[in-house]
């Protein structure tokens, strides 16, 4: 086990480039960090162990030893983890780059074997070629990769992932890309590598190679917002942002293929990039569709629909003395935009309900309560129109000129009054609402702070470092830019 880690340790002294690239945290002095009881393969050292969340992408893919290097596969520094990373589509040319990388960093020949034999030959018991002392020579070249699926984008991190484990809680899945290359050609490459090994090590090498190179691929797992760590979220002014650490270098490459070309033909550039790299902290907004869905689910779970039957004039989120309407505790960490939406939505529904249904107190038990929760839960789904229509019909609408209408004469907040006028584009509010108007008002309240159709599916921490640098230069990392205020504000 941990053949890749052992190879990084022993091969680091072969060349100057190896000394820089093969310095991984798993072979350094351990700095204790907390684990998350998620067992899987660390994508940096490839050992099967308990994982913790990465500082760069907030996903659980790094072990408690490698975390101290603060490296991420999304960095633009050409460290070993970055060199083993490719984005889809995977081509034969990209796979050849991985094979060339292994052959360059982990060569197997008679001189290398003699070098390790001299290093190991300290006592009589170590004279014989034994697996326990020469595990670093048993690193076959396979095309297995840990794949992160960010919706339409897939990131492949190639490595030698030994052992077996449940992948239920892992953000990635292991796939085998050998069918995209050439099985017989890869077999020949490995036969040539193992030809210099002693006979007893050859059999172990061959067994390892065929065992892993013929593994079937797993079905890819879509990454969701729940896969990301909450430990690096910062709550400022009731608005969340995420702290991200990335390794930067002044050198740039047009593509990953050009980076590998320089690795083979211009090693000085790679060494210069490694020596001049720096660690930079980005503060990115956390406004995305995944978080909105999570917040909306929490809103629906904590919602107290009894408020629509009450006589409370205070905003729904501030009620603290009423046992039927108190949700103040639920908003302690909630985004202020969600709180604003909750207040306006319940205040509007309260006004409509009290105007049309004979109800006196928030202790009343009404059949309409589940529909209020459904409005929140379906606010960003295709079922919102159906739910709004059900809520409208529950308010005893009457038929007027071939249209169903509900009465509207209950008190509302001045800010909500202004907002409804803006949504309906009218100078004065009518005393009745049609289903179309009722639908427009609820959708206007839901979409006032962010247009769900224009939000990214995942947080910005999944973007490449070059993208984060560009967004920071353009001033677009902060949430103020990404609020995506609806066009209704421009209509005043």
Curated annotation (Swiss-Prot):
InterPro entries the record matches: Rotavirus_NSP1 (IPR002148)
Keywords, comma-separated and alphabetical: Host cytoplasm, Host cytoskeleton, Host-virus interaction, Inhibition of host innate immune response by virus, Inhibition of host IRF3 by virus, Inhibition of host IRF7 by virus, Inhibition of host RLR pathway by virus, Interferon antiviral system evasion, Metal-binding, RNA-binding, Viral immunoevasion
Domain notes: The integrity of the zinc-binding domain in NSP1 is important for degradation of host IRF3. The pLxIS motif targets host IRF3 for degradation; however phosphorylation of NSP1 pLxIS motif is not required for its activity.
Major site of localization recorded for this protein: host cell
Family named by the database record: Belongs to the rotavirus NSP1 family.
Segments for region (RNA-binding): 1-81
Subcellular location: Host cytoplasm, Host cytoskeleton
Gene Ontology biological process terms, A to Z: symbiont-mediated suppression of host cytoplasmic pattern recognition receptor signaling pathway via inhibition of IRF3 activity; symbiont-mediated suppression of host cytoplasmic pattern recognition receptor signaling pathway via inhibition of IRF7 activity
Span(s) of short sequence motif pLxIS motif: 483-486
Gene Ontology cellular-component terms listed: host cell cytoplasm; host cytoskeleton
Assembly, per entry: Interacts (via C-terminus) with host IRF3; this interaction leads to IRF3 degradation. Interacts with host IRF7; this interaction leads to IRF7 degradation. Interacts with host CUL1 and CUL3.
Function of the protein: Plays a role in the inhibition of host innate immunity by inducing the degradation of key host factors required to activate interferon production such as IRF3, IRF5 or IRF7. Associates with components of cullin RING ligases (CRLs) including CUL1 or CUL3, which are essential multisubunit ubiquitination complexes, to modulate their activities.
Protein name: Non-structural protein 1
Provenance organism: Rotavirus A (isolate RVA/Human/Belgium/B4106/2000/G3P11[14])
Location of the region described as Zinc-binding domain in the Swiss-Prot/TrEMBL record: 42-79
GO function terms (MF aspect): metal ion binding; RNA binding
Span list, region Important for cytoskeleton localization: 82-176
């Amino acid at each position: 086990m941990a053949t890749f880690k052992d190879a990084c340790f022993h091969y680091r002294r072969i060349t100057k480039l190896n000394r820089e690239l093969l310095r991984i945290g798993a072979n350094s002095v351990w700095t204790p960090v907390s684990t998350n009881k998620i067992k899987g393969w660390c994508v940096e050292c490839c050992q099967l162990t308990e994982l913790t969340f990465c500082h760069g992408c907030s996903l659980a893919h790094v072990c408690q030893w490698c975390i101290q290097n603060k490296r991420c596969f999304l960095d633009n520094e050409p460290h070993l983890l970055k060199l083993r990373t490719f984005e889809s589509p995977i081509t034969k040319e990209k796979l050849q780059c991985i094979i060339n990388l292994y052959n360059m960093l982990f060569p197997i020949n008679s001189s290398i074997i003699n070098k390790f034999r001299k290093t190991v030959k300290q006592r009589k018991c170590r004279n014989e070629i034994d697996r326990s002392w020469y595990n670093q020579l048993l690193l076959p070249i396979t095309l297995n990769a840990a794949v992160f699926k960010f919706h339409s984008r897939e990131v492949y991190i190639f490595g030698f992932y030994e052992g077996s484990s449940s992948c239920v809680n892992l953000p990635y899945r292991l796939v085998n890309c050998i069918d995209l290359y050439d099985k017989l050609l890869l077999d020949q490459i490995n036969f040539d590598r193992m030809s210099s090994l002693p006979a007893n090590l050859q059999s172990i090498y061959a067994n390892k190679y065929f065992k892993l190179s013929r593994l079937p691929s797993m079905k890819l797992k879509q990454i969701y917002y729940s896969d990301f760590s909450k430990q690096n979220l910062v709550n400022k002014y009731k608005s969340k942002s995420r702290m991200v650490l990335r390794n930067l270098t002044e050198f740039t490459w047009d593509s990953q293929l050009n980076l590998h070309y320089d690795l083979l033909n211009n090693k000085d550039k790679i060494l210069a990039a490694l020596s001049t790299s720096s660690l930079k902290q980005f503060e990115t907004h956390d406004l995305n569709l995944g978080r909105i869905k999570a917040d909306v689910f929490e809103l629906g779970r904590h919602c107290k629909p009894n408020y629509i039957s009450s006589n409370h004039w205070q905003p729904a989120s501030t009620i603290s003395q009423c046992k039927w309407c108190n949700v103040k505790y639920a908003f302690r960490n909630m985004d202020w935009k969600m709180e604003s939406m909750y207040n306006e939505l319940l205040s509007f529904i309260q006004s409509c309900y009290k105007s049309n249904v004979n109800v006196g107190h928030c202790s009343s038990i009404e059949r309409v309560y589940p529909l209020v929760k459904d409005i929140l839960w379906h606010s960003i789904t295709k079922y919102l129109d159906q739910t709004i229509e059900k809520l409208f019909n529950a308010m005893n609408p009457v038929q007027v000129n071939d249209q169903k209408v509900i009465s509207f004469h209950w008190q509302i907040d001045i800010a909500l009054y202004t907002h409804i006028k803006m949504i309906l584009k009218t100078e004065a509010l009518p005393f009745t609402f049609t289903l179309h108007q009722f639908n427009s008002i609820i959708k206007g309240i839901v979409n006032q702070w962010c247009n769900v159709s224009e939000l990214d599916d995942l947080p910005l921490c999944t973007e490449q470092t070059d993208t984060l640098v560009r967004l920071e230069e353009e001033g677009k990392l902060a949430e103020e830019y990404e609020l995506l205020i609806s066009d209704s504000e421009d209509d005043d």
